[in-house]
């Protein structure tokens, strides 16, 4: 299922998260005034390659970086929600898929964090949940 959408922060509409699931992978970008501040890989749209693909616009994350977690690819954008926070002066966008925290983007970190990341890589960092 391919889709793309944007969600603006209500208190400061100059910030926006764009989510796209097109081509080979899904990703999200935190933007301010059309400038990317942070981006993160969300999931591959099919199996992970052994070596990372680096020449495509929407890169698939390589198997070495993808955790072996059960994950159902969303069928529509309605399954994805963005929640906004402030963290030590930075803007934090939390991305939920089916009401489960899936990824975070912080305005002062170029690469975001994703729960499907097994180890830090060029497309996503590990999302550590504090419970």
Where are these regions (language model features)?
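Structural signature of eukaryotic scaffold interfaces centered on beta-propeller domains
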Residues: 1-13, 18-22, 74-88, 129-131
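Exposed beta-strand and adjacent loop surfaces of beta-rich binding modules
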Residues: 25
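Surface-exposed loop/turn elements that mediate protein-protein interactions on large endomembrane-trafficking
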Residues: 1-3, 28-75, 102-127
């Amino acid at each position: 299922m391919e889709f793309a959408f944007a969600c603006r922060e209500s208190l400061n509409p100059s910030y926006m998260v764009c989510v796209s699931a097109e081509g080979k992978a899904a990703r999200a970008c935190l933007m301010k005034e059309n400038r990317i501040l942070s981006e993160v890989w969300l999931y591959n749209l099919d199996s992970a390659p052994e070596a990372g693909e680096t020449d495509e616009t929407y890169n698939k994350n390589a198997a070495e970086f993808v955790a072996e977690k059960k994950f159902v690819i969303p069928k529509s954008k309605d399954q994805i929600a963005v929640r906004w926070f402030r963290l030590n002066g930075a803007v934090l966008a939390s991305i939920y898929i089916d009401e489960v925290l899936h990824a975070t983007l912080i305005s002062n970190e170029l690469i975001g964090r994703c729960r499907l990341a097994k180890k830090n890589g060029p497309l996503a960092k590990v999302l550590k949940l504090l419970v």
